[in-house]
């Protein structure tokens, strides 16, 4: 797409003779939320490294909009308990950031109250907001969020997902979000890509959220969950494994008596 912020064309990565990523096509446009899901070992971390420019693919290419500003939120950080590091000092590790800029970013994510707290003492939900604030300091056109709700309770997850949507709306940035849960994805996602070393399925949540078989499978949690159609000659079960012919994951074309 001509208005893409980033585009991967037939990207392949091989480690030790084994394909970690195979023929990956992916793009993110301004204002679009793309959620990448898949089991452990599916290549999600490798793909993120390629998006961030930390890894050069062995095949295919990664195109980025010229002078693209990327804000990256890591899955988590480990800080030595004896290190005297406040949230403010942590945010000021980003070049050019002063207290006013740090406070503004924290206010945007609803975490301004922790600005002077030792970073080791804040809660899991507060830490995720601080990491998100750090990603916003670069005024990014593209946000790359690796497990943004990790270690947060269900209520906190909903609040964080709503916050991410508001940030997208406010800044018009694209969002690439990574999840290690095959089927738990935020309802505001525009596009979901299921990765298992290759792109095995993709789609819009709205395409399946109202399907009877989908609702039957997930019950009351259906609006927050999505199963996507596979475009290959195989399917994956709920754990990401390839299932034998004759079995399937429910989709919108399922007919149940």
Curated annotation (Swiss-Prot):
GO terms for biological process: response to zinc ion. The keyword Secreted does not apply. It catalyses: Zn(2+)(out) + ATP(in) + H2O(in) = Zn(2+)(in) + ADP(in) + phosphate(in) + H(+)(in). It is a peripheral membrane protein. Keywords: ATP-binding, Cell inner membrane, Cell membrane, Ion transport, Membrane, Nucleotide-binding, Translocase, Transport, Zinc, Zinc transport. Belongs to the ABC transporter superfamily. Zinc importer (TC 3.A.1.15.5) family. NCBIfam families: PRK09544.1 (NF007090). This is Zinc import ATP-binding protein ZnuC. The gene is znuC.
């Amino acid at each position: 797409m001509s208005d893409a912020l980033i585009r991967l064309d037939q990207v392949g990565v091989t480690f030790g003779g084994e394909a970690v990523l195979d023929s990956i096509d992916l793009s993110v446009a301004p204002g679009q939320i793309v959620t990448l899901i898949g089991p452990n070992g599916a290549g999600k971390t490798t793909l993120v490294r390629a998006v961030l420019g930390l890894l050069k693919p062995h095949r295919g290419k990664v195109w980025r909009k010229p002078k693209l500003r990327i804000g990256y939120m890591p899955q988590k950080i480990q800080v030595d308990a004896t290190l005297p590091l406040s949230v403010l000092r942590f945010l000021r590790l980003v070049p050019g950031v002063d207290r006013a800029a740090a406070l503004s970013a924290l206010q945007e994510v609803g975490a301004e109250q922790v600005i002077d707290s030792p970073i080791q003492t804040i809660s899991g939900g507060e830490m995720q907001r601080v990491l998100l604030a750090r990603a916003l300091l670069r005024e990014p056109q593209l946000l790359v969020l690796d497990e943004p709700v990790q270690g947060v309770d269900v209520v906190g997850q909903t609040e964080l997902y709503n916050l991410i949507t508001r940030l997208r709306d406010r800044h018009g940035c694209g969002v690439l979000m990574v999840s290690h849960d095959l089927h738990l994805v935020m309802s505001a996602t525009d596009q979901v890509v299921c990765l298992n070393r290759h792109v095995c399925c993709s789609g819009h949540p709205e395409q399946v959220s109202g399907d009877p078989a989908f609702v039957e499978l997930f019950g009351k949690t259906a609006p927050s969950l999505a199963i996507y159609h596979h475009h290959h000659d195989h399917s994956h079960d709920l754990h990401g494994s390839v299932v034998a012919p004759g079995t399937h994951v429910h989709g919108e074309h399922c007919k149940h008596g």
